[in-house]
UniProtKB/Swiss-Prot annotation:
This is 2S seed storage albumin protein. GO terms for cellular component: extraorganismal space. It comes from Juglans regia (English walnut). Disulfide bonds join C39-C88, C52-C77, C78-C125, C90-C132. Changing M111A: IgE-binding is retained by the immunodominant epitope.
Length: 139
């Protein structure tokens, strides 16, 4: 009789098994880290870091630029970088420097100034403590 009661108890418990389903609601759908977007897509989404390009171009020139305009490009560059994964920030900045070198034919001291500024941009923006690895020999 005790065996029959135990079997009934087990059968009854099995009949009332509960299934719990959890769902994660992704409210941050615009965040590239959540979408698993690659660097190329992130860079394109940020207009190829056009504000970083303007800012770095002004940084590499001695004088002859509007300081308010430069600050605005710096802020917008930081905004663009903040929307990207850390490793993509550096890749994007390498592309900016490469593009500037090709378009403007930068050499010597101007090129060195641009490379130095680009290396430190994520840190200067306060979005990363990293220093991007950008070598002049790559260009």
């Amino acid at each position: 009789a005790a065996l029959l009661v135990a079997l009934l108890f087990v059968a009854n418990a099995a009949a009332f098994r509960t299934t719990i389903t959890t769902m994660e609601i992704d409210e941050d759908i615009d965040n590239p880290r959540r979408r698993g977007e690659g660097c190329r897509e992130q860079i394109q989404r940020q207009q190829n870091l056009n504000h970083c390009q303007y800012y770095l171009r002004q940084q590499s020139r001695s004088g002859g630029y509007d300081e308010d305009n430069q600050r605005q490009h710096f802020r917008q560059c930081c905004q663009q970088l903040s929307q990207m994964d850390e490793q993509c920030q550096c890749e994007g900045l390498r592309q900016v420097v490469r593009r500037q070198q090709q378009q403007q034919g930068l050499r010597g001291e101007e090129m060195e100034e641009m490379v130095q500024s680009a290396r430190d941009l994520p840190n200067e923006c306060g979005i990363s403590s990293q220093r991007c690895e950008i070598r002049r020999s790559w260009f």
